[in-house]
């Protein structure tokens, strides 16, 4: 049973999507005015792993990642560079997509851009005005926060504390200091669109509400982003969207932790701002992915030269194990009597696979899941050092375990990109043959152990007098 930590309720909850076999997920994309940095990489690799795991356990995932391609920051940067805002944003859209490809992040199903959804945003704002949650001024349109009863629930912020001065935009035309902009009246020289509220452009928060509703509906399963977005961005999204539809909007809110550099927050002013483009020249993308999963996605992670060296060494060790398996398969045998070494590795493989899924089912806990990966690595190394002729079935099973890990974590691509079929079935047939031999020897205790072990791996076997022993895949 999959459980996820919901920022909204501050606890782990059983994951139940609105549609049984489909997950609708929206992850806030970048404001495209600069290069993709390490913090972005951590967020999108984390949600890539979450998406991969959901797909691995049988869900169809509909993922939307937006581009904020018009914003105060884009306008300011375009003026500094002497470029058109559209030209600037398109440049960094391409930078982002290239960086995600470098990091082996699977593409989203849809990448909507704000500038291509102005009519939907205007319609969204009109309905909020109609329902009494928003009001027009000469400067644009504002959402009246006091009209929304549960404001602050996601970020655990008290409205009175907010009014006293925390991260709000001042304006003489606001009814209340905490109200936020849905539409901004155009200033001279800025990009603008016609609207019932006058020429202008959307505010930041309304974009995601309008675009997510268009592609995922008025209710969906997962909304994600960096922890820094929980307030004010995600808090304001909730207020707008629930006010708009009158329905609960998102069931599960997931947020990634911050990336530190040598114990300090990453920033240009400190000179420790690291772009994906630059770091990819120094480290293989798989090393970066492996670095990110060393910490739980909700926890902060500290980038240091020492930590990267440690990560690189550990990843190389796993690659060496996979290579040793490949080489050892050439001298392995398909059948034979198992001794203590075979049964020990079999138990390690069975237990580690179980523990891996247990960890991933506990809010995608990659830290605990990695322990299982190292247990298998150590177990395989020890086994190969003790036997002259290894069991083909066991080696195939170990190989398949690393293939599963690679598919979920986006690793080991060099070994598995040409092999798309699992070795499970061959291993199951091998164990069934071994079990039959044990039953002939009246070693029922060990044959029952194999039967029970196969069930834990997701296979049910039946002894048929006419057809012999047959097996079928079951859900575990």
Curated annotation (Swiss-Prot):
Q: Which reaction does it catalyse?
A: tRNA(Cys) + L-cysteine + ATP = L-cysteinyl-tRNA(Cys) + AMP + diphosphate
Q: Which residues does Zn(2+) bind? A: 28, 208, 233, 237
Q: Which InterPro entries match?
A: Cys-tRNA-ligase, Cys-tRNA-synt_Ia_DALR, Cys-tRNA/MSH_ligase, Rossmann-like_a/b/a_fold, tRNA-synt_1_cat_dom, tRNAsynth_Ia_anticodon-bd
The catalytic activity of this protein is classed by the Enzyme Commission as 6.1.1.16
Q: What is its main location?
A: cytoplasm
**Cysteine pairings via disulfide bonds:** none
Q: Which GO terms describe its cellular component?
A: cytoplasm
- Gene Ontology annotations of biological process type: cysteinyl-tRNA aminoacylation
Does S-adenosyl-L-methionine appear among the keywords?
A: no
Q: Where in the cell is it found?
A: Cytoplasm
Sequence motif 'HIGH' region, residues: 30-40
Give any GO molecular function from the UniProt entry.
Answer: cysteine-tRNA ligase activity
Short sequence motif named 'KMSKS' region, residue ranges: 265-269
Metal-binding among the record's keywords? Answer: yes
In terms of domain of life, where is this protein from?
Archaea
The family line of this record is: Belongs to the class-I aminoacyl-tRNA synthetase family.
- HAMAP family in the record: Cys_tRNA_synth (MF_00041)
**Name under which the protein is recorded:** Cysteine--tRNA ligase
Which species? Answer: Methanococcus maripaludis (strain C7 / ATCC BAA-1331)
